[in-house]
Swiss-Prot record:
Keyword Signal part of the UniProt annotation: yes
Localization (cell): Periplasm
Main location: periplasm
Keywords assigned by UniProt, alphabetized: Conjugation, Periplasm, Plasmid, Signal
Purpose: Involved in pilus assembly.
Annotated signal sequence range: 1-24
Cellular component aspect of the GO annotation: periplasmic space
Gene assigned in the entry: traH
Originating organism: Escherichia coli (strain K12)
Protein's name in the database: Protein TraH
Length: 458
């Protein structure tokens, strides 16, 4: 079962203000993510009452909705047959045959080799053992020569790196397209044209919609995949941000490869999202295909909209409402339900004990990293889902998946560093546990005193 996509892609929304301002950018997505944390819910309390005719009891009700993200999991193109006044277009395969002139040349060649044949015939008749040994040696030489070709091709496809692998696969793509479009006379002609014949580019330019993603020419793989998700419609900067996190492969007009490595835990990006400031992300000079990528384009996040500031404001608001017994709004409820830290308990318990609750503010960094890593993980999940729906070359998908796996490992490593801050959380837990025990002991003592006092007056 696929993991539930938490409504977190919206949080870090209240977090980022990017310069220059834009209607759709990383800032707006993080604000949406932050504002829609948790569930949209509505509840009614259970109750019991006695009427004139009867007694009544009802259990209350619960309504909860979480944010929905649309992911296009399957894309299908149906086959078709074109028929019109000019005829019917259908590809039924092809075959080749030799003509009379070729047959005559072949017979002449056989006759020119007649001396060798007569020699073999004489050996077979007089000394068959020698004939058998000669045939064995000839077969061995032929097998070795044929293996030279196949081993060369295998070396390209197995150990030659990404470029040879894509080169071999593109020859196959070219031949597939040529076969579907009936461009060459037969298989041998298509192999010739798609390799040394120089027809590969012109053939691949005729790729149908279902084959275009297989052609590694003039394509940015991650950009192409993200463009199929409506979540990124009109949000060029968010796509650039995701591409920076996951990395990509950019194929130029001649198949040249420009790799973009994953920068998931780039310190400048993490710091800017947590505390505000400037981070550098990959930027596309063209928003259509993103073939020209500038590696270090600055994106500015204001301090007020960074995660730490937003979380501090929310904690203060929740604390004040707890003191005044005011209901929490949806944003505050979502914030409490989205983090693994029992925030509400750490705010309310000290109020009940009459002590300072400043301890919770010591955990602002930890809470911020907890939410930020959820946001980044969900963006990577979106990217992984869209790559999986594409018809990309196997070698390309392998490289992209390696990039995203590397990004996931970077997040895990970063999380292990953040876990160090759990020491502070454990200290808070111990302090809160001790205070609750004290309160419980005081309440029990007061209850017992009241009980004995009440008993003595009877």
């Amino acid at each position: 079962m696929m993991p539930r996509i938490k409504p977190l892609l919206v949080l870090c929304a209240a977090l980022l203000t990017v310069t220059p301002a834009a209607s759709a950018d990383v800032n707006s997505d993080m604000n949406q993510f932050f504002n829609k944390l948790g569930f949209a819910s509505n509840t009614t309390q259970p109750g019991v009452w006695q009427g004139q005719a009867a007694g009544y009891a009802y259990g209350g009700s619960l309504y909860a909705r979480t944010q929905v993200k649309n992911v296009q999991l399957i894309s299908m193109t149906l086959p078709d047959i074109n028929a019109g006044c000019g005829g019917i277009d259908a590809y039924l395969g092809s075959f080749s045959f030799i003509n009379g002139e070729q047959l005559q040349r072949f017979v002449k060649q056989i006759m020119s080799n007649a001396a060798g044949y007569f020699f073999d015939l004489a050996l077979q008749t007089t000394v068959p053992e020698i004939k058998t040994a000669k045939d064995f040696l000839q077969k061995m030489a032929s097998d070795i020569n044929s293996m030279n070709l196949s081993s060369c091709q295998a070396a390209q496809g197995i150990i030659g790196g990404l470029f040879p692998r894509t080169q071999v696969s593109q020859q196959k793509v070219c031949q597939d397209i040529a076969g579907e479009s009936n461009i060459f006379a037969d298989w041998a002609a298509s192999r010739q044209g798609c390799t040394v014949g120089g027809k590969s580019d012109s053939v691949r330019d005729k790729a149908s919609d279902k084959d275009k993603e297989r052609v590694t020419k003039n394509i940015n793989i991650m950009w192409n995949a993200l463009s199929k998700n409506r979540m990124f419609d009109g949000n060029k900067e968010l796509k650039e941000f995701v591409m920076t996190l996951t990395g990509s492969l950019v194929f130029g007009p001649n198949g040249e490869i420009t790799p973009l490595s994953a920068r998931t835990t780039d310190r400048s990006i993490i710091r800017a999202m947590m505390e505000g400031g400037t981070a550098k992300i990959s930027h596309c000079n063209d928003s259509d295909k993103c073939l020209k990528v500038v590696a270090d384009t600055p994106v500015t996040i204001s301090r007020d909209n960074a995660l730490k500031s937003q979380i501090t404001k929310l904690l203060a608001s929740i604390q004040n409402k707890a003191v005044s017994d005011t209901p929490l709004d949806d944003k505050e409820k979502g914030f409490i339900s989205s983090t693994t830290i029992p925030v509400f308990k750490y705010l309310v318990d000290p109020q009940m004990l009459g002590v300072s609750n400043s301890m919770i503010y010591q955990l602002t960094d930890y809470i911020g990293y907890d939410i930020l890593l959820q946001y980044i993980q969900e963006l990577i999940q979106q990217a992984r889902a869209m790559v999986a729906t594409g018809n990309y070359d196997e070698a390309v998908i392998g490289h992209i998946n390696d990039n995203m796996n590397d990004a996931t490992r970077q997040i895990a490593a970063f999380q292990s560093q953040v876990q160090v801050q759990q020491d502070a959380l454990l200290v808070v837990d111990r302090q809160m546990s001790y205070m609750r025990q004290q309160l419980s002991a005081r309440m029990l003592s007061r209850y017992q005193n009241n009980y004995h006092f009440g008993g003595s007056t009877l």
